[in-house]
């Protein structure tokens, strides 16, 4: 009786919410928030948070793994930035703050080669005008560059802005072995895109140097035009990490 009931319930469940294996489809159809993708027409009240028709979630995410041996110095540098301007990280608090998690090393080819701390920062990005700088734009850019360039942080492969992936593949000792395996298993490049070719260093470049490229994370500024000079944001050295080049609001 119990087995029959379970079979009946399973069959009913599959007919309602499951269409069978394999589970293949567009990413926006695989990942959902409850039933928001298939909800009734109700003025978009139950739309998914990422639905472009509504003013839903829209932000940048910087997610980087800092080697455990460098974490103390990295945090102290961030503290030094906050000491200069205590309000500089308030934008992070509007979202999730700074999420931190421990990760261990792995034998995988594109692995964390040593124990590390993952830092996840979620912050504002204008939906209407992608070239609009954020409040305290320079502080966020400096933290990002500090982690990548000074402390040799590794980017989360599924997050981050373009500049985080510039040269990232070279930080992995077994990158060439991975690429050989990739070529052997996928010689036709069916699982490759222009973007994956760029971040794996196979073709093209992830950075795009043009007017206004820095606020969008397409480049590290080297000229005022890469920021938003018409809105007072100029390319300047970092405040703590002097080698950084960030878009700073110049008021005088």
UniProtKB/Swiss-Prot annotation:
Q: Which reaction does it catalyse?
A: L-gulono-1,4-lactone + O2 = L-ascorbate + H2O2 + H(+)
Biochemical pathway:
Cofactor biosynthesis; L-ascorbate biosynthesis
Q: Which InterPro entries match?
A: ALO_C, FAD-linked_Oxidoreductases_BP, GULLO2-like_C, GULO_Plant
Keyword Transferase part of the UniProt annotation: no
Known EC number: 1.1.3.8
Define the transit peptide region by residue numbers: 1-102
Primary enzyme class: oxidoreductase
Q: Where in the cell is it found?
A: Mitochondrion
Arranged from A to Z, the UniProt key words for this protein are: Ascorbate biosynthesis, Mitochondrion, Oxidoreductase, Transit peptide
State the signal peptide span: none
Q: Which GO terms describe its cellular component?
A: membrane; mitochondrion
GO terms (molecular function) for this protein are: D-arabinono-1,4-lactone oxidase activity; L-gulonolactone oxidase activity
Give the GO biological process terms: L-ascorbic acid biosynthetic process
PANTHER family given in the database record: GULONOLACTONE OXIDASE, L-GULONOLACTONE OXIDASE 1-RELATED
Q: What does this protein do?
A: May be involved in the biosynthesis of ascorbic acid.
Concerning its family, UniProt says: Belongs to the oxygen-dependent FAD-linked oxidoreductase family.
Q: What is known of its domains?
A: Lacks an FAD-binding domain present in all the other members of the family.
Protein name, please? Probable truncated L-gulonolactone oxidase 7, mitochondrial
Organism annotation: Arabidopsis thaliana
Q: Which gene encodes it?
A: GULLO7
